[in-house]
Amino acid sequence: MRHVLTSEAVTRGHPDKLCDQVADGVLDALLTEDPEARAACEAAVWENHLLLFGEISARQEPDYEAVAREVLRDIGYDRPGLGLDADHCDIQIRFHPQSPDIAQGVSHRSAEDTGAGDQGIMTGYACRETPELMPLPVTLAGALVKRLDHMRRSGGMPWLLPDGKAQVSVAYEDGHPARITTVVLSAQHTPNVRTDALREVLRREVILPVLPPALTDEEPLLYINPTGRFVLGGPAGDAGLTGRKAVSDAYGGAAHHGGGSLAGKDSTKMDRTGAYLARYLAKNVVAAGLADRCEVQLAYAIGLADPVSVSVNTFGTGMIRDETLAVWLEDHVDMRPGVVIRRFGLTRPIYRGLATYGPFGENGRGMPWERTDLRFPAQF
């Protein structure tokens, strides 16, 4: 059976992704001062304006404006001609403390008894399509925007500007990647570059080095800056908001998504911690040879430590029944938020870098949820 799966990714200068990085930059700064800080930081950007808002409770707070300006500067919005200028943009800060009604459910004497900071559904996924056990389309889309960012930041293409995005379509035969059918690449640029020259350089220097030759026997359709011009970009062209790239940060549509984003949230928020745990469980199932594909869904209720449901779907590729796997995971893996936070070291300031391209696969290399150290029974 044949089907096509398409996934997208965006550069670090995309307006939505910019907001994710600012929010997680704020979170890292908070955790550096107070590892027990509670945060739900949102960011919105438009033209030369940035708004930080949400809920924060911490014993010591950083200079939020300075943190935001540093993140914007590092991304590349460092001069007035880009519309957004890190040194001169208007920044508004509107934080208030976390609700005491929520705090009483997540703050206990014993860390192990910490309740979930909210209800929610989190999904983790793994498959054999890449060495990192990630879906191929989102992996390739991510590789394209990373290369685009690298060429801009290294000075290799001085006419590139911070905004950009990629989209990759992969045709599957009987559940396995067969060929790449379409690649879309949009790259913001200065007005003095010719469209035909830009397209040829991006094809040769960005796209072709990323695409696996085995999947391009039939040359894919390439759409590079399809409108012909992409000068007005970033927040000058489109407003940005945290959490709007949650699917491309995860599995690119290859798996279900509970709807919650990660950006700006401390580890008591199960949108973050549950997503890491679900990825860990799914990846370990596949790495152990128990399935070729695995999706793990977790659900939590606010104030309760144990998940209210654990489900597994191996899409007919499992060596044992999905129900058996789900029961074993629930019985043998401690899924209480406080335990997961300690196991994965989630009170550390590790989030801004993960916000750039997402926390899974190659992007999460070295992170605890990417380990494959879960031991299953021999009889499995």
Residue ranges of predicted features:
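Glycine-rich, mobile lid/loop segments that gate access to catalytic sites or pores
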Residues: 6, 66, 73-232, 356, ...
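Glycine-rich anion/phosphate-binding loop at the beta-strand->alpha-helix junction
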Residues: 194-286
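N-terminal, positively charged regions that mediate nucleic acid binding
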Residues: 1-40, 46, 372-375, 380
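Short glycine-rich or small-residue beta-strand-to-loop segments that form or flank ligand, phosphate
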Residues: 4-11, 49-57, 122, 126-127, ...
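Alpha-helical support elements that line or immediately flank enzyme active sites
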Residues: 12-33, 126-146, 265-289
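Internal helix-turn-beta structural module
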Residues: 46, 291-293, 300-380
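Short, charge-patterned binding micro-sites
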Residues: 39-59, 302-306
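Conserved phosphate/anionic-ligand binding catalytic regions in large, soluble enzymes, centered on
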Residues: 8-10, 14-19, 115-130, 231-255, ...
